Amino acid sequence: SAKYLINSMPFEGFYGAYRISGRYYQDLELENANEYLHEISFGSEYKRKKETRERRVHSAFAVAQHDEVYYDRDDGSARTSGGVIVDERMNYLRYGPELSARQSGEKISFGLNAKGQLWNYEDTDIVPEYDHEYFLFSLFGQYKFTQTSLLRVTARYYSRRYGDRPAFDLDGQQRVGNPNIRYDYLALGLRARQRLGESMWFGFDVERTERTDQYVGYNDFIRDSFGFEFHWSPGRRFDFELNGSYRLYDYPNAFAFHEIAGGRKTQESVTGRILTSFRMTRHLSLTAEAHLQETVSSDIRIQYDRTRYLIGVRWDQ
């Protein structure tokens, strides 16, 4: 990523930024799993600090292009529908405004975050498109018990409103003529962090998310998430991070394979990640990462295990 400050005033600056991210696999057998994201944003940042109080406001308009191959999870080949290749189905252009604000004090901090986006997916006449509107609004409050421990409460509402995807009936069928899908989410989270000395801290997260299918409730769910994180910096050059999470879904109405004979849909997942970095120079670091993800479901189409190992270099300016 790169950011250029266009104009700077005592407490506010205007900027333009570019970010690129993705995954690239050298093995030709895995090239269909390559993903890329390019994002350009323009906005302003306000920051003012006085003694123990600080105020930050960030506003921007962002445009992003995401590209990936819509491939078969069993054999890795490009997906087809009715004999027609639909490998570009998951490519999309995303754009919209965003705003975040934070007020921090010696003990109490609070803030908000808001987004409004349009996601425009690649046209595929033979299958429904994933085009949708996305809205997000969140609030948080944080309290520092001591200089080394804090507790944060977060409330989020977000919504995805599709333009070309019929909603599901209670029998699991997605019939033409049904209203388009609209999913509304309400999440409440709790985070606790504790610092141990200057070089180490750990934290725990708990969150409950309720999704409402606004048609007849077929795809409603309740998701309980539990997470932990640990960070250790024994010196100026070395960093070590460990984090993991467990998610349990409760679908009261949905069926596996969207078929009544498949029985009630169940899903749970576990993720774990280890990241280490060694700073070789002021700007250059060597990094290594291991990532594990396992999803178990009565709908085996979404059940999988994945383990990734990465090694690379990172440049920070």
Where do the language-model regions lie?
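Gram-negative and organellar
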Residues: S1-Q317
